[in-house]
Regions:
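Beta-rich strand-turn-strand
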Residues: 82, 93-94
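Structural core of flavin- and non-heme-iron oxidoreductases
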Residues: 21, 36-39, 47-48, 67-68
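Repeat-blade elements of multi-bladed beta-propeller folds
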Residues: 8-26, 30, 57-84, 119-146, ...
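Aromatic (tryptophan-biased) beta-strands that constitute blades/sheets of beta-rich domains
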Residues: 1-6, 40-54, 94-116, 163-169
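Beta-propeller blade signature
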Residues: 88-93, 150-164
Length: 169
């Protein structure tokens, strides 16, 4: 029956199951590690990105996380609503102090010489790790709304350091 339906909102993240631990995120960018059999919380991390506001044209949502490892180091990456790329240690749930500034890279930077309204850009998909790079796309309006509408850049950052590597547009 129709009257039993439950509105789930805009939450669309897909959990990751890695080595017996389930990792997932909330719409507001919190990341958790759970025991998939019991639901017991192993750790949680809250970047508090909701305090930075949300994009003008997008509901509060963070679409997912990415797992990366080089065989020795393992990280979870998330691009937050607050325009941050965060590297989280999978064992501790703490930001990686060697990545960006204490685990955070400011995604409001590295757009080149363009000037635009920063509130008009966000991320419509989780980051993706390829080799030693973390790649993040952009979610923008599909048409020019303002004279200073943002570009739809794709950018790459070093998975170890968070250093900006390249931009495609």
């Amino acid at each position: 029956p129709r009257n039993i339906a439950y509105a789930t909102g805009d939450y669309r993240a897909v959990p990751l199951l890695i080595k017996g631990v389930m990792y997932t995120n909330t719409n507001h960018g919190q990341v958790v590690a759970l025991n998939p059999a019991t639901g017991e919380l192993i750790w949680s991390f809250d970047p508090e990105s909701y305090a930075l506001g949300r994009p003008v044209f997008s509901p509060a949502q963070t679409r997912g996380i990415e797992y990366w490892t080089d065989g020795n180091i393992s990280r979870i990456f998330i691009a937050t609503l607050g325009k941050q790329l965060v590297s989280i240690d999978v064992n501790t749930g703490k930001p990686d102090p060697n990545f960006g500034e204490d685990g955070f890279v400011d995604l409001r930077d590295n757009f080149g010489k363009l000037e635009f309204e920063i509130d008009n850009i966000t991320h419509g998909a989780p980051p993706i790790a390829v080799g030693d790079s973390v790649i993040i796309g952009s979610k923008i309006f599909d048409y020019t709304l303002f004279n200073r509408s943002p570009p739809g850049h794709v950018r790459a950052y070093d998975a170890y350091t968070g250093e900006f590597k390249w931009r495609f547009y």
